[in-house]
Amino acid sequence: GALLLRQGHVSPPHLIRAYNQAFQRLGGTHLVATVTDLVRVKHRVTGVLTAVQAYPARQVVLAAGACSRPLLRSLGVVLPLYHTQAELIETGPSPLTLRTQVMAAVNQRFALETQASQPHQQSRWDRPDEEVVPPILDSAAIQFQDGHFCLGQISRTLTSLESPVSARDQEQSDRRLRAALAPLLPDVATLPGAWHRCLVSFTADGLPLVGALPTLAGLSLFTGFTAPFVLVPPLAQRLAEALAGEADPGLAALQPGRFPLANSVPGF
C-alpha cells in the first residue's frame, strides 16, 4: 500500500476576502489607505499615519511584509528582515486539467534567502537598486478551481521595493519560466498568460517576527513569513490571544527580541 498526502493550496484573493468579511462581521472596521509612517511619542507607538490622516491606536500590529523594513527603520529599529521579488506567469482559465500541484523536490529559494541574509551582505540591503545575490528559478505549476494556472517562479533579491522591470526583462523571465516547465508539462508551458511579481519577506533565521518589540511599547510585529499561507492563519490567532493577555510560550522562538539589533533604537 501507499500513503498519499496531497499538498493543499488556497486562492490568495479569495482567502483574504473571506478573512476581511469575517473580521467585519465581528465588528471590525476595514479601511484601505497607504501607510506612510508610524506615529511615535517617546518610546511608544500610538498610531499610523497615512496620506489622508493619522489613525490613533492603543496597539499597532505591523503586518506589512517587505514594507515592514522601511517603516521600522523610520523608527530607528534595525532587524534582519529582507525580501525577494517573486516572478510568475498567471494564465486565464484553461480546459486542461492538472491533477496535482507540480513543484521542485529541492527548493532553491531557501538557500537564496540564506545567502542573501549573511552578515557581509547587510550593507547592500541599505543601498537602492542592488541585486544582492543572483536569481534562482524553482519550476512549479498549480491550477485553481476556476481553471487558471500560476506558473513559477523566479526569485530575485532586489533591494528596492519597487525596482523597475523593463518589458524586455519581463519577456526574458517569461521565456525562462516556460522553458523550465516545458520538459514536465509541455501543454501547460505554452498557455497564454501574463507576467506578475510580488514581494515575499523573510528573516535571517528563516522564522517570522511575531510579537512585541522590546524597545517600543504599543507595537507588535507580524511579518517575515516566507510561507505565509501555511503559518499566518494559526499564528494570527495566537498573537491576537497573546495581545489579549493570554500567555503563549509557543511564540517565544518568534519574538523580535531574539535578534540583538531589535533592542537598539539608534538616534532616538
Where are these regions (language model features)?
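Short, well-ordered alpha-helices that flank and scaffold nucleotide-derived cofactor binding pockets
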Residues: R17, Q21, R25, R73, ...
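C-terminal lid/capping helical subdomain adjacent to the catalytic/cofactor pocket in oxidative enzymes
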Residues: G28, K42, T46, L213-F268
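Secondary-structure boundary/capping motif
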Residues: S11-P12, F202, L231-V232
